[in-house]
Curated annotation (Swiss-Prot):
Switches off the PcM promoter thereby blocking expression of the major repressor Repc (latency factor) and favoring transcription from the early promoter (Pe) and hence viral transposition and lytic development. Negatively regulates the early promoter (Pe) thereby controlling its own expression and keeping the level of early genes expression independent of the viral genome copy number. Coiled coil: none annotated. One of its GO terms (cellular component) is host cell cytoplasm. The modification N-pyruvate 2-iminyl-cysteine is found at residue 2. It comes from Escherichia phage Mu (Bacteriophage Mu). It comes from the Viruses. This is Negative regulator of transcription.
Amino acid sequence: MCSNEKARDWHRADVIAGLKKRKLSLSALSRQFGYAPTTLANALERHWPKGEQIIANALETKPEVIWPSRYQAGE
C-alpha cells in the first residue's frame, strides 16, 4: 500500500460474516461477556476499544486490522 493510500475499515457485513464462519454472532458474544444482546453492535459504528477487542479476539485478529481508521498513528 502506498503511503498516500488509506487503509479501509472492514465493512460491518464482513465482520458479521467472519463471526458467522466461526459459528458466532454479535449477540452471542455480547451475552457471553455479560452485555445485553445488542451491545457489541455499538463497536461496528463507533470507537469502543473494549468491544472492538472482544470482536477482534473472536476473529483471531487485532482491532487495528479491522478498524485501521480508528487506530492510525498520531491521532
